[in-house]
């Protein structure tokens, strides 16, 4: 869930590790929950100009290669969003085949989840979550990275968000090996191609 109150706005990008932040925010005071994983632009429709200038806006991003593995295992083995799969075991039971399917014309990118396009909702560059409709980045005070959450999260929530009781546990964890073990040459390059903006902007490497 993306979360908002009168002091801060958290943009929860799917499978970026933001579940632990959502849990902490929900447990620490007056938070307005707006739907599912909403983009920053959509969240700002709930904010007036006066409140906007005072909001501390933050989000979490994740290495795209790692994020896609997490997404695959979470959606497949929890039977969540079955529409993300083909119904063909040869494709769905093999990560590399699934990656190829997702980025092929066989996958219907126009499906809707809630009120948003399913491809935009789950499979776009994470930067798109914090851009406006013109493709420009919207003000964000802090972009945390999943890879550093273990070391940064407690201090960030206490010092910046002023939370006192911190929950430090994974929310919706997936069980799998290191992401690099799941890729072949082609799938690795597909993710590099489709997530080139994230990879370049956040300096991610395979």
Identify the function of each model-found stretch.
Residues 1-206:
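Membrane-interface amphipathic segments in extracytoplasmic regions
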């Amino acid at each position: 869930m993306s979360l908002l109150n009168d002091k801060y706005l958290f943009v929860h990008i799917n499978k970026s590790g933001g579940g632990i932040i959502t849990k902490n925010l929900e447990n620490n005071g007056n938070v307005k929950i707006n739907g599912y994983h909403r983009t920053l632009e959509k969240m700002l429709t709930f904010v007036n100009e006066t409140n906007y200038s005072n909001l501390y806006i933050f989000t979490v991003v994740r290495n795209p290669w790692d994020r896609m593995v997490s997404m695959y295992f979470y959606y497949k083995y929890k039977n969540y969003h079955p529409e993300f799969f083909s119904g063909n075991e040869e494709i769905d039971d093999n990560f590399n085949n699934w990656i190829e399917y997702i980025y092929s014309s066989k996958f219907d990118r126009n499906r809707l989840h809630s009120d948003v396009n399913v491809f935009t909702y789950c499979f776009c560059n994470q930067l798109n979550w914090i851009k406006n409709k013109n493709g420009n980045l919207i003000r964000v005070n802090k972009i945390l990275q999943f890879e550093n959450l273990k070391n940064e999260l407690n201090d960030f929530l206490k010092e910046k968000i002023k939370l006192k009781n911190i929950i430090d546990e994974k929310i919706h964890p997936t069980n799998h090996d290191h992401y690099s073990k799941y890729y072949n040459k082609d799938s690795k390059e597909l993710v590099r191609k489709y997530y080139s903006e994230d990879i370049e902007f956040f300096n991610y490497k395979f």
